[in-house]
Amino acid sequence: MIARGTHREGRIPPFMTNNHSVFYDEEFGTHSVEATIDNGDFGSRTIRLETGQLARQANGSVVAYLDEDTMMLSTTTASSKPREGFDFFPLTVDVEERMYAAGRIPGSFFRREGRPGTDAILACRLIDRPLRPTFVKGLRNEVQVIVTVMSLDPKDMYDVVAINAASASTQLSGLPVSGPVGGVRMALIVDDDHEDGQWVAFPTREQHESALFEMVVAGRLTDEQVPEKPRKGRRRGRKSSPRKKTDNVAIMMVEAGATETVVERVNDGAPAPTESVVAEGIEAAKPFIAELCGAQQALRQAVDPETEEFPLFPPYGADVLAAVDSEAKGRISDIMSIADKQERDEALSSDMDDTVEALLEEFPEREAEIRAAHNAVTKEVVRSRILADGFRIDGRGVEDIRDLDVEVDLVPRAHGSSLFQRGETQILGVTTLDTLKMEQQVDSLGPVDHRRYIHHYNFPPYSTGETGRVGSPKRREIGHGALAERALKPMIPSRDDFPYTIRQVSEALGSNGSTSMGSVCASTLSLYNAGVPLKAPVAGIAMGLVSGEVKGKMTYVTLTDILGAEDAFGDMDFKVAGTEDFITALQLDTKLDGIPSDVLAGALKQAREARLEILNTMAEVIDEPDPMSDYAPRITTISVPVSKIGEVIGPKGKNINQITEDTGARVSIEDDGTVFISATSGGSAEAAVDRINEIANPQLPKVGERFLGTVVKTTAFGAFVSILPNRDGLVHISKLGGKKRIEKVEDVVNVGDKLEVEIADIDNRGKISLVPVDD
């Protein structure tokens, strides 16, 4: 047995450098490298990547640290043989949130982690989207990337660190991948010292809360710079490395959104997150991405992993592609001019079958290749017509939006509903309101433990005319719901202004391009129909891009309101949501090595013009909150002294339960004395308010007042009757039974009986004497 010290600073001397020096620990056999994130006035953060100690049997493993206390393990493994019958790359990304990372025990019945939560699923998607394109095409071995969050500083967010950890472990796995991916979260901080705002990388939770706008940006280097291989030794010396440039950083993914206080901050003079500001943020992320990619390159060069041989399965051979092109290109060109999606899909499917039948004799046992080549020819036809003629599948111009159809108040008993149609994309929005007691409780590693605005997105198989599984949401549905929620959340009124929990459901009833942005539009309409006073209406649009050489010149054509086929065959999926004044959410995925800044700026400008057109169409139907539905709960807010909260609740909730039983209203009390009263009618709410005020602000009853009370206790000398909350009086036995003498109180009244009484006397100690009221 060998006893080894485990203090981190004893094993790796704590120094930081931008030169990507690799540290090697001979005792433990570990390599590590640091990337320093310099935020100027806001300090610096350090990302450390280490390999060689944990999970040694995985193809590649890396432990990533953010500063000292945030730590996660990423492993990349691959199956030994390719999966038969697969025509796609089977990559799986999983994020495991361990509650011990935050020093907590899971709140589930079994006290162990179960299914991944929403935060973990969204982190999986953030990793998958930029990582998947780095694998060589034609790979069919199963690849699994698992990121396990082991320690989390409460001030940090782990998801972007996980992107870098997953990329680093994949770089060391020996799998056929291109260069590393770097991911960074950028927050636009505006304060007294930075009135124009400064973009801060890897912001803390505190900075996140005070930010105006935030984005996650992932990218890679287009020309790899490989540092020297380090010499062995306990500590590696500093060495110079090529100066990082940002013009060699290709942006692969952007996920962005405004914060909840953006409207108030902009009204107070802060810069609005307009298209130009967002573009500046993307550019500001590039130096940090270069730094992170450089660190991963240095680590890979130091470890020098053995690259394994993996069989590749190209989708088709050149001979098959040439034959399909000759056989079917003319027919495909005609088919791709059909505007109706269903008719076009049926014709294309039929032509694919005809092409297979025509070529199968020439290429026996290569049917899958023929079909894949048919898809490739279809893609080439669509792209070339857009580039050469600006001609789209459905005949629109490149900046045209499909026909819009807007309707509200469709679902009879829903609190709010809408139908938004953009071409063949059809979204039903449904809003439900309830008390703040119905806030979603979140058991995750983050500090957020509840959600007041909840957005759910459903994508049933019939929306594309297909059959499939229904039930629990898939990762895509969770991701689309999160995007729509991020777009709308900054416009949701505060708890004080609108004390309701809001659940918004987006039902994708028909899909042909950007159901997520359709969900944003439908949700704005539905929320207005439900009476929710949004700070401003929000709309969204999906943009696309097709690039290629035309007459020897590189040409970029930006498409507004893309179809599903244009998304699949294009180079970019760019979703932009916002108000009339600024962007509230943005999502970008691209297949290119980089989008020129002027092309990106043009796409943002084009998206704004489309957004304004959609907002105008929506405003023609509804432009302000409707009266609330008769079926929605009415919530009244009052305040009681904090010292009276216990009295209002009563022993074991006796008083508050009695108020609910008597009035039909639901009552919830906050720690600051705010009381929320929910009722289906105004009368019930008023009755509950009166009962609460009687307890919290009691007034002494007067002699001669009459009450319909409840007998709460009987004794040998009389009956105690409750006339007000926490206020009882005694009816002496001599006053019961009229003029007749009775032996037992129970011969006349019992506990629970209603009895009309009058106050006969109140002594100097406040004790109340009652007498029954004769009919």
Swiss-Prot record:
Residues 704-773 form the S1 motif domain. One of its GO terms (cellular component) is cytosol. Residues 633-692 form the KH domain. It holds the Pfam family RNase_PH. SUPFAM superfamilies: Eukaryotic type KH-domain (KH-domain type I) (SSF54791), Nucleic acid-binding proteins (SSF50249), Polynucleotide phosphorylase/guanosine pentaphosphate synthase (PNPase/GPSI), domain 3 (SSF46915), Ribonuclease PH domain 2-like (SSF55666), Ribosomal protein S5 domain 2-like (SSF54211). Residues 231-243 have a biased composition (Basic residues). Gene3D superfamilies: GHMP Kinase, N-terminal domain (3.30.230.70), K Homology domain, type 1 (3.30.1370.10), Nucleic acid-binding proteins (2.40.50.140). Involved in mRNA degradation. Catalyzes the phosphorolysis of single-stranded polyribonucleotides processively in the 3'- to 5'-direction. Belongs to the polyribonucleotide nucleotidyltransferase family. This is Polyribonucleotide nucleotidyltransferase. It comes from Corynebacterium kroppenstedtii (strain DSM 44385 / JCM 11950 / CIP 105744 / CCUG 35717).
